[in-house]
Design a protein with these regions (language model features):
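Surface-exposed, low-hydrophobicity beta-strand/loop segments enriched in small/polar/acidic residues
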Residues: 1-150
Length: 150
């Protein structure tokens, strides 16, 4: 599989300190079937990082609300020494441990889990404020697009 031809990768937010809350850009999933929200946490302080997903009716964040249907979550607890993904309990959010490790967290979201009946087809990842020594970055990896949204 050629990742650049079979997926659409979009930056949610670039690397930044977690001393303040971080909100990723909203992505329109109207013509997609699935998105993996990938968050990298370089944890430099023993403060947990709370991650959430919100849905909206437009990429401006119109009517934003938390997702309500639990989605599969995967974790690499120490990405500096391992590349093994471990399935976590399905949930609508995830909070990291306080361990000083580089972590990868993936939310697997089928677009059907969004409130599409009420027009919610946009998604955003958010990180609550933790500590400035915690550096975070996130991407959306979209699959199953009928055609690319611009």
């Amino acid at each position: 599989m050629n990742i650049s031809e079979n997926t659409h990768i979009v930056s949610a937010f670039g690397p930044q300190a977690g001393g303040s809350a971080i909100a990723g850009d909203y992505i329109n999933l109207k013509n997609a079937s699935h998105v993996t929200v990938l968050v990298e946490v370089a944890q430099g302080n023993a403060t947990t990082v709370a991650l959430t997903l919100e849905q909206a009716t437009a990429v401006a964040g119109t009517g934003s609300k938390a997702i309500t249907e639990a989605v599969p979550i995967y974790l690499v607890a120490d990405a500096d020494t391992s590349d093994v993904w471990v399935r976590q309990t399905n949930a609508v959010s995830y909070t990291t441990s306080a361990a000083l490790k580089t972590k990868l967290v993936a939310f697997d979201v089928d677009v059907d889990t969004l409130d599409t009946n009420n027009g919610f087809d946009c998604l955003c990842v958010k990180a609550a404020a933790s500590n400035a020594a915690n550096i975070l970055a996130a991407q959306y990896i979209v699959t199953g697009e009928r055609y690319h949204n611009v």
